[in-house]
Design a protein with these regions (language model features):
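N-terminal acidic, glycine/proline-rich low-complexity segments
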Residues: 1-120
Length: 120
């Protein structure tokens, strides 16, 4: 059985990948779509990291994360999501971590971009 892991906004919004970090980390190429947005569109919003966190969880496993109890996720008629605790459920949510955890997660994300420098 494989759990479905969700990263709610509360978790991903706590990790911001700043534009200057992105530009530096992808310095190995001039043609990176996110880098181009930051360099040409006067965009300084940074990126929140909820999507990469689920990938890290899939690759690295659960040990780096605090996860909710098991449950069942449902989609409501109004488009909102519900979560019902269930010992037999196949869904779990990542829980927000502290500042040290957020820094560690950002470093993992940044290292993926930096690794590509050595492979080009």
């Amino acid at each position: 059985d494989v759990d479905i892991i969700f990263d709610p906004m509360e978790t991903g919004n706590g990790i911001e990948y700043l534009p200057e970090q992105v530009i530096s980390d992808v310095s190995w190429t001039d043609y990176h779509p996110i880098k181009q947005v930051y360099m040409t569109c006067n965009c300084d919003t940074g990126q929140m990291m909820w999507d990469p966190l689920t990938v890290i969880n899939a690759v690295e496993g659960d040990d780096l994360f605090m996860l909710s109890e098991r449950g069942i996720v449902g989609l409501n008629d109004d488009g909102s999501v519900s979560f019902t605790l269930s010992a037999t459920g196949n869904s779990r949510f990542q829980m927000p971590g502290d500042d040290a955890w957020r820094s560690a997660m950002l470093e993992i994300i940044r290292n993926v971009n930096k690794i590509l420098i050595n492979n080009n």
